[in-house]
């Protein structure tokens, strides 16, 4: 089989780069692999613009949850011809790595490679918002502000700690603006909306019983988000 492995260098530190190289070396032992490293969005987009030409059997993304979501959207945007046996593999190299938790993946090189070369794959539920797709979760309001405020370079250095720092900052200085949303024909004014296609939130914190392989999207609408109501919802 012909593999395409794309590693988002912005998603991880040097230690994870060593891990990616170990996986790559193991994968190359019995397979053909085209390997790409990207530092910019434009570099990644260029790869996907030419993706149809190579007739890849597998796409492997080494990066975070956002890297996988980006890849899916670029494949669709560029009208990729999905073969019946085409599959996307994943090497966790991001910060939160919700997908790693969702798939109950371990961090052993041999185990990851065995999954990547296997034919044991399943279709994931894909959700569309406007012109973009997501497969884990999408939010607008409180947590979206936190994610948007985080500098990618600082996140690469501090890892998950930066989410805690920014989360605490936005918790202390909560300043919500009402959002207008229509859901199932009913109108709401809300402070935070979270649509989840996964059981996990913010790492390994379980919020649902669903998973990415089930058509059971769960949407939370926080109409009056306060510090107390947020703590109650989390705990």
Region roles according to the model:
Residues 17-19, 72-75, 101-103, 206-207:
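Short amphipathic alpha-helical segments
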Residues 44, 66-71, 98:
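Short glycine/serine/threonine-rich phosphate/pyrophosphate-binding segments
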